């Protein structure tokens, strides 16, 4: 067995012992030992993608949906650099990736050798752990070094602050197994009981809940994050404090408010609803109005990590690991009744407006899609307007898991992340999967639709809002600039039907709201297009705000 093959086989075996079940491979020559070892191991399901950026976001989707580490493999050079956006998203979102980059041996670095760049510490502070593994040598002691290093990286990816780790692996030729090669000087097998080389206790101690003070005018804010929303919903029920839940908090159920985005944009409402206390969890940031509202609270208790807590507008006064309601709390207050009445009025006004036209607008699509999906479904929300429209009009419901790339909030890798999330969701026994994204996100990651004939395929319906450009900019300050359309609107004229045909995927176009439920029924990977007008959508969002304001004044 040659050294490169030995390192790869030992590394993959140890990862499988630790619990690795998914690996994504971007093809390349220098990474051959890793690729061959992975596809030979029946404990690991492998996915091959020709584009490193697509591969890396596929891994993000797999890891995010499964809540388990996923391995990601590439060759040397720019291949490793193309992983960087996904590594940043994994860092900010707390997604566990095991990034394995193949590299040239030290004697080829800095010499002008082909496909060779400096990969040492390539991802900087975005990784929880980095190791330059070193060139494998045919000597005793290497197996213990390799296996213990893998265990250390695995633990770092899942410790108190989960995230990506990076092992840089220098492989010398030969890169493929050689028949009848020299025997290895020590057994390459791991522990005889099949357990990992090092068993690391990753159990997190549950923090002692801090009892909150009793105030009538409290508010609970649930931002993006993978946490259990049940304690926050219970806190709301015990205190009567309104719960403002972003869609990817998965706390928008029961009595959570779904109209806070519009309510907090009404000056009279905000003036009459000054909070005494805000309790927040996760990473809020979808709504400028919500962030502005946080500044109005004299006390802001953040529930989160004592170091990496979210405080985007620097209003935190306390950071705790968990909270509990004060014994004197009562949910029956004028404060709770006022918020509930405003929510009911806002929701009714929004529904009247959206239901007044059977044409499928962007807002109605977001509302109806979230409502129609069957229990047990996964919904991936694209960045920019799709997630914001869901935030504006998605009604509270149970039985739906909603995720998105909210760490860095880029549109890159959207399709690939959705595919990965769907694959993991269904591998774990979940139901159907759906994605809501814009046309630019689709075009930005068309390679995510290209699955080889032997690749695992998800049941995923991708609903594409096609407004021929970047709709979010129509909501921002630059919308009135004379060069807006070219520089920000970025019309492209690409037909989604052509994109589907290129990838060999089924395609459906939906125009009327009544046709949406039927269009969502189907197996496999498929595209559903809803064509809209950016200017009309911007007007409808303004009309929604005006309708809600009129209803609660």
Swiss-Prot record:
Gene3D superfamilies in the cross-refs: 3.40.50.970, TPP-binding domain (3.40.50.1220)
The enzyme's E.C. designation: 2.2.1.9
Pathway(s) of this molecule: Quinol/quinone metabolism; 1,4-dihydroxy-2-naphthoate biosynthesis; 1,4-dihydroxy-2-naphthoate from chorismate: step 2/7; Quinol/quinone metabolism; menaquinone biosynthesis
Cofactor, free-text remark: Binds 1 thiamine pyrophosphate per subunit.
InterPro entries linked: MenaQ_synth_MenD, MenD_middle, THDP-binding, Thiamin_PyroP_enz_TPP-bd_dom
Enzyme class: transferase
Classification via SUPFAM superfamilies: Thiamin diphosphate-binding fold (THDP-binding)
One Pfam family matching this protein: TPP_enzyme_N
The keyword Magnesium belongs to this UniProt entry's keyword annotation: yes
Keyword Manganese among record annotations: yes
Keywords, sorted A to Z: Magnesium, Manganese, Menaquinone biosynthesis, Metal-binding, Thiamine pyrophosphate, Transferase
Catalyses which reaction(s): isochorismate + 2-oxoglutarate + H(+) = 5-enolpyruvoyl-6-hydroxy-2-succinyl-cyclohex-3-ene-1-carboxylate + CO2
GO biological process: menaquinone biosynthetic process
Molecular function (Gene Ontology), one example: thiamine pyrophosphate binding
Cofactor(s) the record lists: Mg(2+); Mn(2+); thiamine diphosphate
Family label: Belongs to the TPP enzyme family. MenD subfamily.
Role description: Catalyzes the thiamine diphosphate-dependent decarboxylation of 2-oxoglutarate and the subsequent addition of the resulting succinic semialdehyde-thiamine pyrophosphate anion to isochorismate to yield 2-succinyl-5-enolpyruvyl-6-hydroxy-3-cyclohexene-1-carboxylate (SEPHCHC).
Record's subunit section: Homodimer.
The protein's name in its UniProt record: 2-succinyl-5-enolpyruvyl-6-hydroxy-3-cyclohexene-1-carboxylate synthase
Organism, as annotated: Thermobifida fusca (strain YX)
């Amino acid at each position: 067995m040659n050294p490169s093959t030995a390192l790869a086989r030992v590394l993959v075996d140890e990862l499988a012992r630790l619990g690795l079940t998914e690996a994504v491979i971007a093809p390349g020559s220098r990474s051959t030992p890793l690729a061959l070892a992975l596809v030979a191991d029946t404990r690991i399901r492998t996915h091959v993608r020709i584009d490193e950026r697509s591969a890396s976001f596929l891994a993000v989707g797999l890891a995010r949906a499964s809540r388990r580490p996923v391995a990601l493999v590439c060759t040397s050079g720019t291949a490793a650099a193309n992983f960087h956006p996904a590594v940043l998203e994994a860092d900010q979102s707390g997604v566990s990736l095991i990034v394995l980059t193949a590299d040239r041996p030290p004697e080829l670095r800095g010499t002008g050798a082909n496909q060779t760049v400096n990969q040492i510490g390539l991802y900087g502070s975005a990784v929880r752990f980095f190791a330059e593994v070193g060139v494998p040598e045919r000597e005793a002691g290497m197996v213990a070094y390799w296996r213990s290093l893998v265990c250390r990286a695995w633990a770092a990816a899942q410790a108190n602050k989960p995230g990506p780790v990076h092992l840089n692996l220098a492989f010398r030729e030969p890169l493929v197994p050689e028949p009848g090669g020299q025997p290895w000087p020590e057994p390459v097998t791991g522990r005889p009981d099949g357990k990992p080389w090092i068993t690391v206790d990753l159990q997190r101690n549950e923090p002692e809940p801090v009892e909150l003070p009793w105030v009538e005018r409290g508010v609970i804010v649930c931002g993006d994050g993978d946490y259990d929303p049940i304690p926050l919903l219970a806190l709301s029920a015990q205190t009567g404090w309104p719960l403002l839940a972003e869609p990817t908090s998965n706390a928008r159920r029961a009595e959570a408010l779904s109209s806070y985005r519009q309510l907090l944009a009404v000056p009279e409402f905000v003036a009459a609803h000054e909070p005494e206390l805000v309790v927040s969890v996760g990473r809020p940031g979808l709504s400028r109005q919500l962030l502005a509202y946080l500044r109005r609270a004299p006390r802001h208790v953040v529930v989160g990590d004592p170091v990496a807590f979210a405080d985007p507008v620097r209003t935190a006064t306390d950071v705790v690991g968990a909270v509990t309601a004060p014994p004197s709390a009562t949910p029956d207050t004028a404060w709770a009744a006022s918020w509930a009445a405003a929510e009911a009025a806002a929701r009714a006004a929004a529904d009247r407006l959206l239901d007044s036209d059977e044409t499928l607008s962007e807002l109605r699509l977001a509302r109806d899609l979230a409502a129609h999906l069957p229990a047990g479904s996964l919904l991936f929300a694209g960045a920019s307007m799709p997630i914001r429209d869901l935030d504006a009009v998605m009604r509270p419901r149970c039985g739906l898991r909603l995720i998105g790339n909210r760490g860095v909030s880029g549109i890159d890798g959207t399709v690939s992340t959705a595919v990965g999330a769907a694959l993991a969701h269904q591998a774990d026994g979940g139901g159907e999967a759906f994605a809501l994204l814009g046309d630019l996100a689709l075009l930005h990651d068309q390679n995510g639709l290209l699955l080889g004939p032997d690749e695992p395929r998800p049941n995923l319906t991708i609903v594409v809002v096609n407004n021929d450009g970047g709709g979010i900019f129509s909501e921002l300050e630059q919308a009135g600039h004379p060069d807006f359309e070219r520089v920000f609107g970025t019309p492209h004229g690409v037909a989604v039907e052509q994109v589907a045909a290129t990838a060999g995927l089924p395609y459906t176009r939906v125009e009327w709201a009544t046709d949406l439920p039927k269009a969502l029924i189907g197996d496999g990977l498929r595209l559903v297009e809803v064509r809209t007008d950016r200017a009309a959508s911007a007007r409808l969002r303004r009309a929604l705000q005006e309708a809600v304001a009129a209803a609660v004044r």
